[in-house]
């Protein structure tokens, strides 16, 4: 019998509910499916016996409290995860379970075998010999990012309630929307959450522990062309699409996601659409160093300036907006929070994998709101697409880690 017998049933139930976020929406949360799912989670939290379960209409967060069962006061710990999934088909998720995976075989996702998980293409599969994997059927993403985290947090709280002999302080949990579109934590109420520190359960493989993220900005580029009939176009037409091509060509070709790793930053063209008359581009700009981000933003603004000098003032409008900052700026003064997670992992024979996140987490913003919030593994591999999978054993270890962190929090305070 599984140690956490409701963990996987919860997860499988959650991933079959479609909860994609929508970056073009103006509501909070961005989609009604998230609202419905969050209210369902409220019922689950009440059912297991958590206190102060509530939904915040202003930010879309469901929060709850597991009251302390000890006499002394220890720091209040929080756990956070997000309910939305990435911009890939998430309707009709049909998970497959592969027991005792041998670490070598190709896993056929769809019946026709058009989509497969091949260890030659995905060498991370070799790490899961002997484990139970949950995959997609090739037509959707899985939603392990981050419904693994949701299921793990609720399971850990349920386990504490069922095992009062395990001593713990106050624990707050927060389940929120819209992380995938980068706005979920914008309106997070840190004062109401009121923890001394927290962890997002939103990482990947076992042992992952992250307290460094990118500094991030987004850029939207609007280009106004001049359209006339091609027969009369000489020295008159300004093709907005050609301007867009020239704009993109001005950026360093090797400073893109597909050619960078480690601590290297990048410029990433997300979308380009338009006509001869007008074109629109969307970029993200990333760098681990705050000064590096400012340098990249200045470069992008200079490209727009150069395009206007070439094609006429006002043709190109670049709007650059900061998104989040490297939470290491905060965590460097709170390394005890990182060490607590690291020590908990080591105590249960997990090797911590401490590395910078080539992305961001909700903790990137929440840390700057006064709650130091590193990121911990939740199990998802190959996130955001049809090749996503998760190990049952990794999910169980994530729950183990949360429990051990709380035990250490009591012992050390």
From Swiss-Prot:
Its EC number is 3.4.11.4. It catalyses: Release of the N-terminal residue from a tripeptide. It is an enzyme of class 3 (hydrolase). Zn(2+) 2 binds at residues 145, 180, 384. Its cofactor is Zn(2+). InterPro entries: ArgE/DapE_CS (IPR001261), Bact_exopeptidase_dim_dom (IPR036264), Peptidase_M20 (IPR002933), Peptidase_M20_dimer (IPR011650), Peptidase_M20B (IPR010161). Keywords: Aminopeptidase, Cytoplasm, Hydrolase, Metal-binding, Metalloprotease, Protease, Zinc. Binds 2 Zn(2+) ions per subunit. Zn(2+) 1 binds at residues 82, 145, 202. It is found in: Cytoplasm. One of its GO terms (biological process) is peptide catabolic process. GO terms for molecular function: metallopeptidase activity; tripeptide aminopeptidase activity; zinc ion binding. The active site is at residues 84, 179. GO terms for cellular component: cytosol. Cleaves the N-terminal amino acid of tripeptides. Belongs to the peptidase M20B family. PANTHER family: PEPTIDASE T. This is Peptidase T. It comes from Latilactobacillus sakei subsp. sakei (strain 23K). The lineage of its organism: Bacteria, Bacillati, Bacillota, Bacilli, Lactobacillales. The gene is pepT.
């Amino acid at each position: 019998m599984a140690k956490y017998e409701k963990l996987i049933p919860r997860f499988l139930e959650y991933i079959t509910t479609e909860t994609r976020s929508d970056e073009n929406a103006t509501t909070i949360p961005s989609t009604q499916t998230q609202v419905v799912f969050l209210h369902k989670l409220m019922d689950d939290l009440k059912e297991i016996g958590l206190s102060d379960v509530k939904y915040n209409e202003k930010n879309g967060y469901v929060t709850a409290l597991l009251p302390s069962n000890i006499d002394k006061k220890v720091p209040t710990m929080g756990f956070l995860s997000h309910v939305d999934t990435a911009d890939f088909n998430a309707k009709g998720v049909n998970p497959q379970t592969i027991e005792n995976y041998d670490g070598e075989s190709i896993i056929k996702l769809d019946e026709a075998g058009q989509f497969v998980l091949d260890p030659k293409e995905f060498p991370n599969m070799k790490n899961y010999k002997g484990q139970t994997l949950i995959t997609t059927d090739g037509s959707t993403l899985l939603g392990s990012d981050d419904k693994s985290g949701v299921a793990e947090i609720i399971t850990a709280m349920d386990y504490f309630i069922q095992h009062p002999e395990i001593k713990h302080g106050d624990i707050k949990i927060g389940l929120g929307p819209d992380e995938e579109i980068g706005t979920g934590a914008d309106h997070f109420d840190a004062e109401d959450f009121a923890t001394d520190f927290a962890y997002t359960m939103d990482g990947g493989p076992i042992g992952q522990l992250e307290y460094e993220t990118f500094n991030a900005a987004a850029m939207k580029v609007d280009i106004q062309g001049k359209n006339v009939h091609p027969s009369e176009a000489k020295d008159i037409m300004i093709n907005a699409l050609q301007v867009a091509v020239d704009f993109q060509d001005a950026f360093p070709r090797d400073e893109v996601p597909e050619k960078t790793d480690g601590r290297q930053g990048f410029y990433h063209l997300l979308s380009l659409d338009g006509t001869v008359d007008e074109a629109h581009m969307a970029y993200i700009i990333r760098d681990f160093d705050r000064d590096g981000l400012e340098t990249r933003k200045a470069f992008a603004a200079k490209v727009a300036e150069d395009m206007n000098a070439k094609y006429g003032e006002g043709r190109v409008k670049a709007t650059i907006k900061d998104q989040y900052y490297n939470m290491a700026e905060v965590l460097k003064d709170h390394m005890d929070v990182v060490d607590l997670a690291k020590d908990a992992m080591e105590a249960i024979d997990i090797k911590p994998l401490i590395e910078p996140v080539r992305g961001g987490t909700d903790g990137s913003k929440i840390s700057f709101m006064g709650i130091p919030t590193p990121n911990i593994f939740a199990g998802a591999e190959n996130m955001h697409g049809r090749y996503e999978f998760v190990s049952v054993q990794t999910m169980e270890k994530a729950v183990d880690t949360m429990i051990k962190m709380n035990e250490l929090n009591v012992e050390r305070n």
